């Protein structure tokens, strides 16, 4: 199976495209998946080996509906209020990527340019595998 790289994209198509080109230049033959949450500037580049999950109109994740499930969330925590729940949206996008790509992937920020070979990132003995877990609010300690 080919190695998979996932990128969550928000309104910066030139930067995301440059990130993919740098990955291709210094990396192997990876399948790249772009989860597009743009509301102004979607990722429209046609690139071989790149699959776009289009969530620009909430086709995959309706963020307002999902955030409404947590009416008592604290808007003062982190940058949530200042960035329109960007962190929450990013987390939900990564969770959806786990569902869409169950065999695993390396998550890459869209604003990162690769300068050397990154095949070592795929060595299981050298990396951390993450997962998302849910916990009832009663079990969370503050």
Residue ranges, per PLM feature:
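Structural beta-sheet core signal
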Residues: 5-7, 34, 107
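N-proximal low-complexity "stem/linker" segments adjacent to membrane-targeting elements
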Residues: 1-21
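Active-site-proximal specificity loops/subdomain of glycosyltransferases
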Residues: 43-100
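Acidic ATP/Mg2+-coordinating residue in the GHKL
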Residues: 36-38
């Amino acid at each position: 199976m080919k190695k998979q790289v996932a990128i969550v994209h928000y309104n910066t198509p030139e930067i995301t495209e440059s990130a993919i080109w740098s990955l291709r230049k210094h990396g192997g033959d990876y399948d790249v998946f772009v989860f597009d949450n743009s509301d102004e500037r979607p990722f429209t580049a046609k690139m071989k080996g790149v699959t776009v999950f289009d969530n620009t109109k909430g086709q995959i994740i309706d963020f307002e509906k999902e955030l409404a499930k947590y009416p008592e969330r604290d808007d003062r925590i982190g940058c949530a209020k200042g960035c329109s729940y960007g962190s929450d949206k990013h987390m939900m996008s990564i969770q959806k990527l786990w569902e869409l790509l169950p065999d695993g992937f390396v998550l890459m920020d869209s604003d990162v340019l690769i300068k050397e070979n990154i095949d070592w990132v795929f060595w299981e003995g050298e990396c951390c595998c993450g997962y998302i877990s849910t916990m009832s609010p009663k079990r969370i300690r503050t």
